[in-house]
């Protein structure tokens, strides 16, 4: 499902923001 790919991208984006 596409939503899973989008969710993974969102999680990666949030994780990167919290790392900074």
Curated annotation (Swiss-Prot):
Keywords: Amidation, Secreted, Toxin
Intracellular or extracellular location(s): Secreted
Keyword Repeat on entry: no
Family: Belongs to the cationic peptide 04 (cupiennin) family. 04 subfamily.
InterPro entries: Cupiennin
Expression by tissue: Expressed by the venom gland.
GO CC aspect terms: extracellular region
Name of the featured protein: Short cationic peptide-4c
Transmembrane segments: none
Pfam families associated with the record: Cu
